[in-house]
């Protein structure tokens, strides 16, 4: 790593309320010039890292780059998901509407530590990717709510119409494997009247009344602007996110939907 790039990674620009943006210090640099372990270490602390001015990698190069840091999560389509709006979407991820909060890997055999997006084409209005710092949400929650959360287990059910689906059961609270911090593991329910491939939730471990209270509270608390960073995409952006502490989703598109993201997940 050159000294100038090292300084750029260490300094960067702080995002609000969390995250860091790093701009390439010289022309001609690509993602491959950023050591993956340095990048993930930065992402572990900042939770979200935005790289601008770095050239994107082809799919094979991107997979090799990320594999240097660990195993890559594989799906039926391979390791890299092309996120584009489709004319007849079988899943809400490919629709022009919003994507409620969730975490990656709820229906997978292993939960990824990080995921990385490349923005191949970023033109359009709306569609910001929104990240919620669940660690901070937990820290600032009232004690009586924390006690309910600690007893709650949620079963998620969705038809496998895309690359994931079935049944998954998770405690509402988790422990971050690297930092030991308490995290919130929650995927918001998806109303079948609004979303392709809806998601249904059952809350166990607490009373039905408390289950309703928990879900209604999370609907408001997780979307509090104090805990959320909304990324407005530009063509060429690279975003690395820490999957254990964050929940993420997407705002609905309000105009053109000619956007193309590529996503890969590192276990």
What is each stretch, according to the model?
Residues 59-70:
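Glycine-rich loop at the start of a catalytic domain that most often binds anionic cofactors/ligands
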Residues 47:
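Structured binding elements
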Residues 32-40:
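Short, acidic/polar
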Residues 52-55:
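Structural motif
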């Amino acid at each position: 790593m050159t000294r100038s790039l090292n300084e750029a990674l260490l300094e960067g620009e702080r995002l609000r309320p969390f995250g860091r943006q790093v701009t390439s210090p010289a022309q001609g640099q690509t993602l491959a010039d950023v050591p993956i372990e340095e990048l993930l270490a930065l992402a572990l602390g900042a939770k979200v890292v935005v790289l601008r001015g770095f050239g994107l990698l082809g799919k094979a190069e991107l997979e090799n780059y990320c594999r240097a840091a660990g195993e890559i999560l594989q799906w039926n389509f391979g390791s890299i998901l092309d996120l584009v709006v489709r004319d007849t979407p079988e899943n809400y991820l490919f629709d022009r509407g919003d994507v409620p909060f969730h975490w990656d890997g709820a229906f997978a055999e292993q939960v990824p530590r990080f995921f990385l997006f490349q923005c191949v084409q970023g033109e359009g209005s709306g569609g910001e990717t929104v990240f919620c710092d669940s660690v901070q949400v937990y820290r600032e929650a009232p004690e009586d709510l924390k006690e309910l959360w600690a007893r709650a287990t949620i079963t998620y059910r969705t038809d496998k119409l895309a690359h994931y689906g079935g049944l998954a059961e998770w405690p509402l609270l988790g422990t971050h494997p690297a930092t030991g911090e308490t995290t919130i593991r929650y995927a918001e329910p998806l109303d079948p009247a609004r979303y392709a491939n809806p998601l249904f939730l059952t809350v166990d471990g607490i009373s039905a009344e408390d289950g309703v209270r928990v879900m209604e509270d999370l609907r408001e608390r997780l979307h509090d602007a104090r805990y959320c960073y909304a990324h407005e995409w530009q063509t060429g952006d690279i975003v690395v996110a820490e999957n254990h502490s964050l929940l993420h989703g997407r705002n609905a598109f309000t105009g053109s939907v000619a956007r193309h993201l590529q996503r890969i997940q590192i276990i």
